[in-house]
């Protein structure tokens, strides 16, 4: 631990505390070494994290060095809760809790709370009031994650601030590198966005993220690694939000930081199935509204800006009605190209087809150069509340708010304010061009999704992203989508990604691959990339599946896969299982799958690519208990519906 050698202050002795998960396999050791609070993590006695620093530097004192371990207490957590909008509807969370008290040389205390379940660690700092001091500014966290040198990484770089379209980055849309060594500098030199996946050789896997971020803190990310494999928690860059607002979060005392989470397993199953983002947070406000999840159409993804007019939007309402979908999303420029006066007429037309409406807004404000309208409605509370009341009165069911400015506390306040005001008016909210959701499905009852990923629009913009579509799609179930909703906006049935299905980017993946992503990518409101022409030019088997696919799930199980190569998941909606797989490799992949939800004699519907890569569906009878043999074509997929 070379980072320890630079510290010369020695404590008289190193006290230690240990907490394990209920099954005792996952263990956290906490101690003080050379005045620095540290923790380490093992799973089944194999090292996941070596001694890693804890603490922070604040305006009220330094809690990163010259610290003494002065107390500890233990507790057990056992709670059951229900949650819509995530990968599982019924959750039983059991964990052992350890509270460690550390005292700095000024005799000021902090508590570090660890909650350890069988495969998850969540920890945070709690600060009391210090005399008459009623607030604190956290200037820097020294929280670290020190991996063994042989660890490889699956990470998405943090971009420069104020770059990209109209200076709107960072927005969690950079390209991943897989199985990369730790000692390579990130693309921009700013570290990596959460969540961060690590393969600790034969010792196992670890996923690092955070949850419970609201208006009282900023969003964080990981730094670049030191030569010793140490990543530390990094705050937003000062340049974010066009330089407005501080990068250092402030909060009232007593107070606490968000939870930082580490999910650990000897394989990828605990990573994919984790519910830790929601286990340690609680709803922030009740709602008097009933929000309906479902599927939608949106013209912008294929027909782009020119389609935001009354007549084209009616075509997408008709498409939604033909598919039995609940929603249509009207994207940017509706305020000028359709007009506020005609919007009520449009919504009345949609309602006549049993389709409800989402409308797009810019987050607006003074932090980028966006001109697409509507602008200057969401950043000002007086204007925002008036606008949302109007939306409620004309029958709009939700909004999609785009182009945020970064991860500073100032922006987190805006996310929360939009959500809270929207709930007052019965509006659901999707975020786009945005930060990562951090437990928000449980915290905010009207939150229904975030992009925060290199999403479907990029397939339209560049052929490169079509060429890499299968690779990227085989990453998301292991990384981005495992910690929160992912509003991807995909499932294309056009072969060519333009309005007339005759030009633009060429889709490389098969139709069944596209169908499988409707199950693999989890978001409670799914705006699919279908087009009106698909009603006549897409295979009927694809349309039939897309008419019945759900968007909410009661259970999710990892079946098989490796990030960037292939993935197979099983999701249950009510009493029906959807087992979906995709293959990113350039040759067919034969798999013998263990499916505990299947038994000999079950009749299931199998969707596969034939040898000409055309979709084919047939009912088959399973010949064995728990086992099915599948072949996925190159850049193809399969589905089993039971």
Can you describe what each PLM-predicted range is?
Residues 329-510:
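Aromatic- and carboxylate-enriched substrate-binding clefts and catalytic-loop regions
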Residues 252-327:
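An acidic-aromatic substrate-binding cleft motif
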Residues 620-642:
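C-terminal beta-strand-rich structural cap/linker in extracellular carbohydrate-active enzymes
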Residues 16-273:
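N-terminal accessory beta-strand-rich subdomains and adjacent acidic, glycine-rich linkers
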Residues 82, 86-92, 545-569:
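Edge strands and adjacent loops of beta-rich recognition modules
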Residues 562-600, 638-640:
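Carbohydrate-binding surface patches
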Residues 512, 516-558:
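Catalytic cores of secreted or luminal carbohydrate-active enzymes
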Residues 1-16:
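Bacterial Sec-dependent N-terminal signal peptides
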């Amino acid at each position: 631990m070379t980072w320890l050698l630079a510290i010369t202050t020695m404590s008289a002795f190193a006290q230690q505390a240990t907490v394990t998960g209920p099954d005792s396999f996952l263990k956290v050791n906490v101690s003080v070494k050379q005045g620095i609070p540290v923790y380490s993590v093992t799973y089944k006695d194999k090292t996941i994290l070596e001694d890693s620093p804890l603490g922070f530097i604040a305006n009220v004192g330094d809690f990163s060095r010259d610290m003494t371990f002065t107390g500890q207490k233990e507790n057990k957590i056992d709670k059951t809760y229900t949650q819509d909008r995530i990968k599982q509807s019924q959750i039983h969370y059991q964990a052992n809790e350890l509270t460690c008290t550390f005292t700095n040389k000024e005799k000021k205390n902090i508590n570090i709370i660890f909650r350890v379940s069988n495969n998850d660690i969540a920890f945070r700092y709690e600060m009391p009031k210090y005399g008459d001091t009623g607030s604190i500014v956290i200037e820097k966290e020294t929280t670290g994650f020190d991996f063994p040198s042989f660890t490889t990484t699956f990470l998405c770089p943090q971009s420069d601030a104020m770059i990209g379209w109209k200076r709107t980055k960072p927005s969690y849309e950079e390209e991943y590198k897989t199985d990369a060594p730790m000692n390579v500098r990130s693309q921009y030199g700013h570290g990596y966005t959460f969540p961060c996946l690590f393969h600790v050789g034969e010792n196992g896997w670890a996923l690092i993220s955070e949850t419970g971020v609201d208006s009282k803190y900023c969003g964080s990310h990981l730094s670049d690694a030191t030569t010793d494999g140490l990543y530390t928690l990094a705050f937003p860059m000062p340049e974010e939000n066009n330089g407005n607002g501080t990068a250092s979060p402030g909060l009232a005392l007593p107070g606490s930081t968000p939870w930082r989470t580490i999910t650990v397993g000897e394989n990828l199953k605990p990573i994919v199935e984790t519910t830790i983002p929601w286990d340690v947070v609680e709803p922030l406000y009740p709602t008097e509204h009933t929000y309906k999840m479902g599927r939608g159409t949106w013209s912008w993804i294929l027909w782009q800006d020119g389609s935001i007019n009354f007549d084209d939007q009616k075509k997408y309402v008709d498409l939604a009605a033909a598919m039995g979908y609940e929603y249509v999303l009207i994207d940017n420029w509706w305020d000028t190209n359709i007009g506020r006066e005609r919007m009520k007429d449009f919504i009345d037309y949609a309602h006549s087809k049993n389709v409800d409406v989402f409308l797009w807004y810019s987050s607006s404000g003074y932090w980028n150069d966006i001109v697409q309208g509507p602008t200057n409605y969401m950043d000002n509370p007086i204007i925002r509340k008036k606008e949302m009341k109007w939306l409620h009165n004309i029958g709009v069911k939700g909004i999609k708010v785009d182009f945020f400015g970064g991860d500073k506390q100032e922006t987190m306040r805006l996310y929360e304010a939009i959500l809270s005001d929207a709930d007052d008016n019965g509006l659901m909210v999707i975020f786009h061009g945005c930060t990562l959701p951090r437990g928000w499905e449980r915290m905010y009852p009207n939150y229904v999704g975030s992009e925060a990923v290199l999403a479907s629009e990029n397939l339209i913009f560049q052929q490169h992203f079509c060429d890499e579509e299968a690779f990227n799609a085989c990453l998301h179930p292991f990384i981005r989508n495992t910690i929160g909703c992912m509003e991807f906006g995909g499932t294309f049935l056009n072969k060519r990604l333009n309005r007339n299905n005759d030009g633009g980017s060429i889709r490389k993946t098969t139709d069944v691959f596209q169908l499988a992503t409707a199950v693999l990518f989890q978001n409670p409101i799914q705006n699919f990339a279908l087009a009106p022409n698909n009603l006549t030019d897409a295979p009927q088997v694809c349309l039939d599946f897309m008419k019945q696919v759900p968007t909410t799930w009661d259970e999710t199980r990892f079946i098989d896969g490796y990030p960037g190569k292939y993935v197979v998941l099983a999701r249950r909606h009510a009493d029906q299982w959807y087992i979906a797989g995709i293959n990113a490799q350039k040759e067919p992949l034969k798999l013998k799958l263990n499916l505990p939800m299947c038994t000999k004699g079950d009749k299931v519907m199998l969707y596969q690519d034939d040898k000409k890569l055309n979709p084919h569906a047939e009912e088959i009878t399973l010949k064995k208990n728990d086992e099915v043999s599948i072949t996925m074509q190159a850049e193809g997929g399969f589905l089993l519906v039971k």
